[in-house]
């Protein structure tokens, strides 16, 4: 696999790995060029919308997996493919010294690491524990302290790119932790993402992710508002989207993940807002941004409004829909 580890100048403070060439596709095929000797089992905990395709990409690169999910049905296809399924995070830690967790909330992460049957019950010294959940940076820091007491290494590595990028192996990972361990983390994360960025100490990966998702929420609401206004002014939605995407208003929410049904194929808005990134999770991430803004005394006027909107959506029946359903919410709710 052609890849490069690029070290930018000291002024930029940015260290990242970027894959320039993707390996040929193949279902669960070992296509990574690393030596077979490096393919020791990797633990993977959390097989939801993101964790499932991430784990599959590790399999495609030849890594045997030790699997756990709180919902046994989520493990079935991996078991059918020959991967080992165990009954707790502690059992994962007993069998693997490199573990990736991908969980919905801070509470889930705390339980997976510090619970009665958590990773820390059986973690081996020298193990590398990578948490790709999006959680409170303060929780990441506390988990890192507990992991360090056990002689292991913890890194936070939340992701950006959504389900589509998870499936194609083109996620962006934002990594926080001891810099000397970055190369070890990159070996695994590079099988699931095309960009692996070192952000700094533990918690900085989460900080970067929270900032990104706050901006994403704001831009999605703005795109939905602009599209709704244009449609009500008589513009064809496809034409309006085309104009926006060749103009200064262009953004990811307008050109890659448009919230208006019928404008794009292959996005949640084309499937009654099913799949994708849930409204509940966006509300959760905006809550993390709100908490961080409060603790750092940072004004986030639009971020706070976005948080209110997504909380309102959850209360009005949109909790299981993709976060781009804010367009549908604006169309149907006229009492603002």
From Swiss-Prot:
Gene Ontology molecular function terms on file: 3-hydroxyisobutyrate dehydrogenase activity; NAD binding; NADP binding
Pathway: Amino-acid degradation; L-valine degradation
Self-association state and partner proteins as the record states: Homodimer.
N6-acetyllysine PTM positions: 60, 76, 121, 145, 149, 238, 242, 321
Keyword field: Acetylation, Branched-chain amino acid catabolism, Mitochondrion, NAD, Oxidoreductase, Transit peptide
InterPro entries for this protein: 3-OH-isobutyrate_DH-rel_CS, 6-PGluconate_DH-like_C_sf, 6PGD_dom2, 6PGDH_NADP-bd, HIBADH, HIBADH-like_NADP-bd, HIBADH-related, NAD(P)-bd_dom_sf
One Gene Ontology cellular component: mitochondrion
Active-site residue numbers: 209
GO biological process, any: valine catabolic process
Cell location: Mitochondrion
Keyword Ion transport: no
Modified residues (N6-succinyllysine): 60, 76, 95, 141, 149, 238, 242, 297, 321
Highest taxon listed in the record's lineage: Eukaryota
Family of the protein in this entry: Belongs to the HIBADH-related family. 3-hydroxyisobutyrate dehydrogenase subfamily.
Organs and tissues of expression: Detected in skin fibroblasts.
Protein name: 3-hydroxyisobutyrate dehydrogenase, mitochondrial
Transit peptide: 1-36
Keyword Oxidoreductase appears in the UniProt entry: yes
Catalytic activity, as annotated: 3-hydroxy-2-methylpropanoate + NAD(+) = 2-methyl-3-oxopropanoate + NADH + H(+)
This enzyme's EC code(s): 1.1.1.31
């Amino acid at each position: 696999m052609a890849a490069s580890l690029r070290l930018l100048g000291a002024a930029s403070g940015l260290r990242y790995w970027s894959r320039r060439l993707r390996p040929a596709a193949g279902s669960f095929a070992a296509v990574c060029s690393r030596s077979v000797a490096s393919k020791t089992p990797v633990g993977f905990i959390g097989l939801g919308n993101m964790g499932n395709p991430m784990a599959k990409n590790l399999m495609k690169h030849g890594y045997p997996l030790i699997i756990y999910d709180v919902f046994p049905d989520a493990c079935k296809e991996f078991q059918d493919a020959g991967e080992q399924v165990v009954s707790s995070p502690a059992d994962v830690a007993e069998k693997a010294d490199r573990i990736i967790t991908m969980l919905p909330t801070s509470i889930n992460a705390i339980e997976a690491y510090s619970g009665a049957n958590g990773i820390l019950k059986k973690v081996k010294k020298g193990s590398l524990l990578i948490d790709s959940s999006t959680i409170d940076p303060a929780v990441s820091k506390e988990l890192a302290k507990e992991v360090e007491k056990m002689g292991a290494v913890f890194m936070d590595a939340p992701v950006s790119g959504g389900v589509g990028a998870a499936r194609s192996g083109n996620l962006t990972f934002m990594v926080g932790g001891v810099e000397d361990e970055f190369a070890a983390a990159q070996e695994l994360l590079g099988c699931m993402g095309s960009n692996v960025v070192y952000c700094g100490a533990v918690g900085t990966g989460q900080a970067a992710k929270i900032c990104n998702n706050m901006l994403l929420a704001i831009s999605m609401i703005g795109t939905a508002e602009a599209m709704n206004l244009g449609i009500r002014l008589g513009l064809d939605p496809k034409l309006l989207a085309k104009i926006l995407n060749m103009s200064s208003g262009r953004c990811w929410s307008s050109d890659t993940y448009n919230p208006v049904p019928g404008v794009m194929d292959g996005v949640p808005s084309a499937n009654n807002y099913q799949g994708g990134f849930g409204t509940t999770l966006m509300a959760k991430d905006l809550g993390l941004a709100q908490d961080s803004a409060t603790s750092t005394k940072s004004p986030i006027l639009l971020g706070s409004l976005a948080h209110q909107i997504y909380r309102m959506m959850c209360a009005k029946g949109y909790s299981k829909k993709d976060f781009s359903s804010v367009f549908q919410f604006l169309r149907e709710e006229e009492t603002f």
